[in-house]
Amino acid sequence: MVRLIGSLVFGGLIVLLASSNAHMVETRLGPLAMIAPHFVVLGITFFLGFAIGIVSVLANVMTRRKQKSPGKSIVIKR
């Protein structure tokens, strides 16, 4: 737990130092406007796309499981 918190603090310090020298970009998503460093915007869009992909794959798997009938319920009578 301490190692996790330490690595998060270390990563936060790296982001702070890197953002002080980065180009600022204004991003507008409808009514939401955000001014952030360029690499932060790229990271946010990457992780949002990654999360959307994971959610869509999980949704497809769940719908396929609901449509399939379980194999053990099939009884063959001779």
From Swiss-Prot:
Membrane side Cytoplasmic: residue ranges: 60-78
Source taxon at top rank: Bacteria
Cell membrane recorded as keyword: yes
Transmembrane segments: 39-59
Alphabetical keyword list: Biomineralization, Cell inner membrane, Cell membrane, Magnetosome, Membrane, Signal, Transmembrane, Transmembrane helix
Residues of the signal peptide: 1-22
Subcellular location, record wording: Cell inner membrane; Magnetosome membrane
GO cellular component, one term: magnetosome membrane
Lumenal topological domain: 23-38
Upregulation: Part of the probable 18 gene mamAB operon.
Disruption phenotype: Cells have no magnetic response and no magnetosome membranes. Deletion of genes mamH to mamV (amb0961 to amb0978) gives cells with no magnetosomes and no magnetic response.
Membrane topology recorded in Swiss-Prot or TrEMBL: Single-pass membrane protein
The family this protein is said to belong to: Belongs to the magnetosome MamL family.
Miscellaneous section: This bacteria makes up to 20 cubo-octahedral magnetosomes of about 45 nm in diameter which contain membrane-bound crystals of magnetite (Fe(3)O(4)). Expression of just the minimal mamAB gene cluster (amb0961 to amb0978), including this gene, is sufficient to form a minimal magnetosome chain with small magnetite particles.
Protein name: Magnetosome protein MamL
Gene responsible for this protein: mamL
